Amino acid sequence: MQTILGASVQIARELARELTHSFSADLRLVSRNPHKVNDTDTLMSADLLDGSQTLNAVKVSRIVYFAAGLPPDSSLWEKQFPVMLQNALNATRQVGAHFVYFDNTYMYPQDSRRQTEDMPFQPSGRKGRVRAMMANMVLEEMLRGEIPVLIGRAPEFYGPGKTQSFTNALVLDRLKAGKKPLVPLRDDTLRTLIWTPDASRALALLGNTPDAYGQTWHLPCCEEPITYAQFVSQACSVFGKETSWSVLNKIPLYIAGIFSKGPRELRELLPRYEADNLFDSSKFKSRFPDFRITTYRQGLENLYTEWKATSALNKDD
């Protein structure tokens, strides 16, 4: 049995697909209100803030994946994320399962240094400090050595379905709505983006590779970073739209934060858009040279095809 904790987020749904498709896994999906991804999935409703519910959710599991998400609310992150993670670690240790932690890069310095798995944590802002604390909790569990543990870390997403990211919200969702794309701060800095299904495929592969444990892995991205100018140009071409976008500077974003909690919560992430983002996934590519990485063009074409198919179904309804 392989169990996904936090199974409602997009990365978890893609992970469920991959585990069933490529590893024929008996799969349990756990969240407050889980829904099947595959016909054979077992569903379990659980509150990860409750230790006993978390323990019950992972019983008889061989591998436990932690992919839980929360809304971008710093207070919520500080109160709930460490508790959820500690409950998951305790429960996994108690049943003797493997633990796979899906992570992001919020704890990394927001500058142009090349990011490798041994990059020191230098979090900026409350959410970054929470993610650093959580990563350290997992690293401590790894050092404890009682259960096999690994970390799979991803940069910013773009992708299908309900993928949540700046890139989806400001570029891709706006193209779908017939609006001009927006770019945060600069369109000439290099970005490293990961196609959500690639992140999930890689996480499933790591979880089912015995010698991957005891390590942190950067999940695989395209070889060459891309500027937002290049990415938006490709997206406009795929969507058949005029190649045009607007660059949002800090002033309107900060003004928006005065009146709305959403922009205010995301402001701490803005410095990363002023510098190149160079996320190095060469370690994964060296260990898994046959892993197929989706190019930006392929990802955009897949997303466009999915959107058109969904739009057609909605019209029929």
Regions found by a protein language model. Give the residues of each.
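Conserved beta-loop-beta element that borders a ligand/cofactor-binding pocket
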Residues: 104, 136-161
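Mid/C-terminal beta-alpha module of Rossmann-like enzyme folds, strongest
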Residues: 2, 202-266, 281, 295-296, ...
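A conserved pocket-lining segment of Rossmann-fold NAD(P)-dependent short-chain dehydrogenase/reductase
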Residues: 173-194, 205, 211
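NAD(P)H-binding glycine-rich loop region in Rossmannoid oxidoreductase-like domains
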Residues: 35-95
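N-terminal Rossmann NAD(P)H-binding glycine-rich loop of SDR-like oxidoreductase domains
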Residues: 2-22
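Conserved loop-to-helix N-cap of the C-terminal "lid" that shapes the substrate pocket in Rossmann-like
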Residues: 151, 187, 192-200, 216, ...
